[in-house]
Design a protein with these regions (language model features):
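Intrinsically disordered, low-complexity, hydrophilic segments
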Residues: 1-67
Length: 67
């Protein structure tokens, strides 16, 4: 998956991210800046999931939006 593409299109993808993770605030999504590790951290923080689970969710999101 291409995180450079996601980062470059992050403003357009913020709605997708908020749709997938409704607990993320606008600030959370903005602060993630389309970077995988930042988004993983935000998902972990808001949902209280382990890092590997947050990574799995973020990778699934990336695969879906990179089509």
């Amino acid at each position: 998956m291409n995180w450079d593409t996601i980062k470059g299109n992050w403003k357009q993808l913020t709605g997708e991210a908020k749709s997938q993770w409704g607990k993320l605030t606008d600030d959370d999504v903005q602060q993630a800046e389309g970077e995988r590790e930042k988004l993983v951290g935000k998902v972990q923080e808001r949902y209280g999931v382990a890092k590997d689970e947050a990574e799995r969710q973020v990778d699934e999101f990336a695969a879906r939006v990179n089509k």
